Structure formats: C-alpha cells, structure tokens
Regions:
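Secretory-pathway/luminal and periplasmic proteins that interact with or process carbohydrate-rich
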Residues: 154-161, 277-282, 366-372
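Active-site-proximal alpha-helical
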Residues: 272, 292-386, 393
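Surface-exposed patches in mature extracellular/periplasmic domains of secreted proteins
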Residues: 135-153, 251-260, 280-287, 355-362
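Non-catalytic architectural context of zinc metalloproteases
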Residues: 35-224, 229, 233-234, 252, ...
Length: 400
C-alpha cells in the first residue's frame, strides 16, 4: 500500500482589516454677525431761529424733525378766519394739494436749453410744471414754454440765446425784457442766483433759470428752503406759475391799474411752488414755509441784520395800494415774497387756490385790483386789510 504524502493544509488567510475611514470633521458654523444697529438720528438741540437757519447737521436738516398736527378747526369765512387762524395753512395747502393730485394737466410743449458748462441740479422739469398745471387746470396756460438754464460761466451764451429768442418781438417788449439775463447775475459773487418767468407777446412762456453750483449755493444760503428751491424743483414751479399769471392777464400786465400788486404776484408764486411741489405732505409744506420765512420772525434780529419787522402797523402800511406808484420798492425783498405768502394763504383758505387765477382772469377784463378783490373774495380790500395784518402779525409773533 502506497502511503501518499500527507497533504499540506493551506492556512486560511487572515483577512486584512478594512481601514476605518477617518471621519469628516463637522464644520464649525460661522457665527452670524450681529448687525450694527442704524443709529437713530438725534435731533440737534438749538433755538427756533437757529433751526430755521441751519445747514445740514449729521446728514439731515434740523427742520425735518418737525411734524405738524392736522388742526381740528378750519376757517370757512371772513367771519371766523381769525378765530380759526391756526387752521389757515392746512386749509390752504389742502386746496392746492387735492387739485395737484387729481386734476388733469394742461401743460403745453416744454423746451429746455442748458448752457454748455451748466449742470441742472434738478432735472424733472416737466413733472414740476405739470403739478402747477394740474392745480390750475381750468386757467389759461402757455402752449409753449422755453427755458434757458445757465450758470455764471454761461452767462454770455445765455444772453445770446435769449436775445435770438426775442428777436422778433416789438421794441416795446425788448425795452422791458432784453437785459434780463445780464441783470440776473452778480459779477462780484460770480453767480447767476435768480430766475424769471414771463410770456412774450404771443403768450408763449419764457423761463430764465440761473444755476448756482451746489457747493457755492451752500456758502450763499445753506438753509433748507434754498436747497428745496434748487434741488427739489420749487423754483421751476414758481417761475412756471409766473408764466400762467402773464398768460392770463395778457396785455394788461403793463397797465398798472389792471395788474395786481407785486406782492400778490410774488406771494402767490411762493405759495404755489410750495403747495404744488409738496402736495403729498403737509409736514414738508410747513417745513419749507417756516424756513423760508426765517427773516420775519422776531428772534431773527434787527433790520440791520437783514431781518424784517412784522407788526400790524407795518403790515397795514405794506398792504396799502398807495405803493403802486413805487411798486413797493421801499419795502424789504422778503415782505414781497415770504411775508406776502402768508396773506395769500388767508385768501386761499377762505376761497380756494383757484381764486388766485380767477383774480387774474377778472383783472384781464379791465378791472382794478380793488374791484377784483371784492368780486373774488366777497369783501372790500380796505375792509380786509386790518384782518390780514392782524393774522399775519400773530403768526410771526407766535413762531407759526
């Protein structure tokens, strides 16, 4: 018997252990940064008059902290207007505000020519004019308005463009109007810090807009009202309303007896620029109104400081029609603008903002201001003067 070789038993291989995977580390979450809270603007502590004069403080005009409640009582007639005098501004604003919101614009064609070195600080020209147009939608308005905008560097250019524009006008028109561009600029300050709105003999509107660079304007008048006029379009609205005044009264503009006093023309334009451009905010209307009147409050200072003294006596004298012959030239500039705006507010509060253009329409039919006032406002002008003087004086005496 053959003995076979003993088979060699192959050892069972020891399995190579699988490598234990290295666990992926759980990422440490990035902490969500805590947002830095936006600091609540702090209202600067300053006097009433300093607030009106103030430039921007920490990015904001101090006047913009002011808010104004809706008055509970509004005037309805000459009989209750003094008693409810704290509601005059709101009632007047409400009248023009509603029309600017809801009425249809009658704005004609607008042509804007800007100097080669001039940058407009406000560019929504047509929308600004359109708000005024809507507010007075039933009144006559120019079918064409040409605006020439220029800074001091472009004064000669503007003068040439303007003279070409009026080249076909009669000599009588040129005598009264041809120097306008040159008259608007100050050689000593090197600025054209003014604007003019009027019509030609065909009833087409012309607006001459002096433009002051932002930084230079801040050195001339850093206040909120100056900013609003330049950069929020109030000057555009003001001058467009002047073209409406001239369009309506037409040939009678140069007949003194059938033209309103200069304070009525300018005071109504100040009211309209503010009411139309700030139609959506009574607070904004009141802020501009206060700052624009900064020279007429008692805390302003003396006349030597350029301030205006407002009293019943000065207002009664100012409102006298005996000053027609001198065109009120013996009164401070501000009396014919911001102080007169307060008189206009009273009239609008009683009879509505369209009473302003209604007066021009009536005077265009060869009626005097006294006749027009009685016809539109239902009281003789002489009877209204003491009440108007009393109301306006009370407003300034009480910082309203």
């Amino acid at each position: 018997q053959l003995i076979g070789a003993t088979p060699t038993v192959s050892p069972t291989p020891t399995p190579t252990p699988s490598a234990t995977p290295t666990p992926t580390p759980t990422p440490t979450p990035t902490p969500t940064p805590t947002p830095t809270p936006t600091p609540t603007p702090t209202r600067p502590s300053m006097s009433f008059i300093d607030m009106l004069r103030s430039p921007v403080v920490n990015g904001r005009y101090p006047i913009t902290f002011e808010t104004f409640p809706t008055p509970s009582k509004l005037p309805t007639s000459w009989e209750d207007v003094y008693e409810n005098r704290e509601g005059i501004a709101y009632k007047a604003w409400l009248s023009i505000s509603e029309a600017a919101k809801t009425s249809k614009s009658s704005l004609g064609t607008i042509k804007v020519t800007t100097g080669p070195n001039t940058t407009l600080p406000f560019t929504d020209i047509e929308p600004a004019m359109s708000l005024v147009s809507k507010a007075f939608s039933g009144a006559g308005q120019p079918s064409l308005v040409t605006m020439i905008a220029f800074n001091y560097q472009d004064q000669s250019w503007a003068d040439g463009v303007y003279r070409q524009l009026i080249a076909s006008e009669p000599d009588s028109f040129k005598r009264n109007h041809q120097e306008y561009v040159l008259d608007m600029c100050s050689a000593s300050r090197k600025v054209c810090w003014s604007a003019m709105g009027f019509t030609n003999t065909a009833g087409e509107g012309i607006i001459l807009l002096g433009v002051v660079e932002r930084e230079k304007l801040r050195t001339l008048d850093p206040s909120y009202s100056s900013y609003s006029r330049s950069e929020e379009g109030l000057t555009i609205a003001h001058e467009y309303f002047h073209t409406v005044q001239r369009k309506i009264i037409d040939k009678n503009w140069f007949r003194m007896e059938f033209t309103p006093p200069i304070w009525f023309n300018e005071g109504s334009a100040v009211f309209v620029e503010n009411g139309a451009m700030n139609f959506n905010s009574f607070d904004r209307y009141m802020r501009f109104r206060l700052v624009d009147s900064k020279l007429a409050y008692p805390s302003c200072g003396t006349t030597a400081d350029g301030c205006i003294t407002v009293s019943e006596a000065t207002m009664t004298n100012f409102l006298s029609l005996s000053h027609y012959s001198t065109n009120w030239s013996n009164f401070p500039f501000g009396m014919k603008y911001e102080v007169s705006q307060r008189v206009i507010e009273v009239l609008v509060a009683i009879k509505g903002h369209k009473s302003l253009t209604d007066l021009y329409t009536y005077m265009a039919q060869d009626h005097t201001f006294e006749q027009g006032f009685k016809h539109i406002y239902g009281i003789s002008y002489e009877s209204a003067i003491p009440l108007l003087a009393k109301i306006v004086t009370d407003q300034f005496a009480n910082n309203r």
